[in-house]
UniProtKB/Swiss-Prot annotation:
Subunit: Heptamer of 7 subunits arranged in a ring. Interacts with the chaperonin GroEL.
Gene Ontology MF: a single term: metal ion binding
Lineage of the organism: Bacteria, Pseudomonadati, Pseudomonadota, Alphaproteobacteria, Rickettsiales
Cystine bridges: none
First and last residue of the signal peptide: none
UniProt record similarity statement: Belongs to the GroES chaperonin family.
Protein name (record): Co-chaperonin GroES
Organism this protein belongs to: Rickettsia peacockii (strain Rustic)
SUPFAM superfamilies, per database record: GroES-like
Length: 95
């Protein structure tokens, strides 16, 4: 991928929910919930403090995270849908 977020921003590839239920019922796109889990694919360098020092982000590429339903901005790079948001919009890392 050729996208590098700036400062305290991260790029997340959403993890889509299943197309079918366990019982075999197909879920149409119109009723699917917006994904709230994803994998981090790019991170910014960090945020500057008052002294001008850059503090790196806690999150790293490959982390699976949980974020708010309406967090971030959706973009598309080379056919891949991503969500760009601030690190502080992430609730936590999924183990």
């Amino acid at each position: 991928m050729s996208f590098k977020p700036l400062h305290d921003r991260i790029a997340i590839k959403p993890i889509e929910q299943e197309e079918k239920t366990k019982g075999g019922i197909i879920i149409p796109d119109t009723v699917k919930e917006k994904p709230m889990q994803g994998e981090i694919v790019a991170v910014g360098n960090g945020i500057r403090n008052k002294k001008g020092e850059i503090h790196p982000l806690e999150l790293k590429v490959g982390d699976k995270v949980l974020y708010g339903k309406w967090a971030g901005t959706e973009i598309e790079i080379k056919g891949t849908k991503l969500i760009v948001m601030k690190e502080s919009d992430v609730f936590g890392i999924i183990n």
